[in-house]
């Protein structure tokens, strides 16, 4: 997940209301993203799942 180094034309812009980009990965396999997209509030990471969030609405 790249927050500030946008690579045109592949970046994603999140809509209003869900204006944070995020990526969810499993703790043991951090190279494989499970899910990515837009969210309104960054979730807290747990023992099994790690969340990475941007503080912008644009990300790669």
From Swiss-Prot:
Cellular component terms (Gene Ontology): extracellular region; membrane; other organism cell membrane
CDD domains in alphabetical order: TFP_snake_toxin
Entry's localization field: Secreted; Target cell membrane
Keywords: Cardiotoxin, Cytolysis, Disulfide bond, Membrane, Secreted, Target cell membrane, Target membrane, Toxin
Cystine pairs: 3-21, 14-38, 42-53, 54-59
Entry-linked Gene3D superfamilies: CD59
SUPFAM superfamilies registered for this protein in UniProt: Snake toxin-like (SSF57302)
Expression (tissue specificity): Expressed by the venom gland.
Pfam families: Toxin_cobra-type
Keyword Disulfide bond: yes
Any one of the GO BP annotations: killing of cells of another organism
Function: Shows cytolytic activity on many different cells by forming pore in lipid membranes. In vivo, increases heart rate or kills the animal by cardiac arrest. In addition, it binds to heparin with high affinity, interacts with Kv channel-interacting protein 1 (KCNIP1) in a calcium-independent manner, and binds to integrin alpha-V/beta-3 (ITGAV/ITGB3) with moderate affinity.
UniProt record similarity statement: Belongs to the three-finger toxin family. Short-chain subfamily. Type IA cytotoxin sub-subfamily.
Subunit structure: Monomer in solution; Homodimer and oligomer in the presence of negatively charged lipids forming a pore with a size ranging between 20 and 30 Angstroms.
Name this polypeptide is given: Cytotoxin 2
Native species: Naja mossambica (Mozambique spitting cobra)
């Amino acid at each position: 997940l790249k927050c500030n180094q946008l690579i045109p034309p592949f970046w994603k812009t999140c809509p209003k209301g869900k204006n944070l980009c995020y990526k969810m990965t499993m703790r043991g396999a951090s190279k494989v993203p499970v899910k990515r997209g837009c969210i309104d509030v960054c979730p807290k990471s747990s023992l099994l799942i790690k969340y990475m969030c941007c503080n912008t609405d644009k990300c790669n």
